[in-house]
């Protein structure tokens, strides 16, 4: 089984079935503070099948095995993961770094066993990388 953020699936074959689950009231709280989607879709292949995921902004998709080492991800970078991967909200210990460091106060910690697929450039990072190249209209 693969779980992914709502809207991340691009296409799938007939043998793959989708289940949508919400995190309940606790999930709504986590979604509100972490910036991740309230709904996760689970995909299960009843027979051999294929599924493809896509991103909503420019960048790359990076596969990471979190079995040996947990990973802290910025909001909106989690695309999909194996069902064995746990996702939890992570609070920055240094409040100043969260507010002024561009990392955000709340992130997502991903622990294994299993693999996750991450979007490498959240829209905020894209905007920050393009800002110096934009000429101000004076």
Predicted regions and their residues:
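Composition-driven recognition of glycine/serine/threonine/acidic- and proline-rich low-complexity segments
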Residues: 1-138
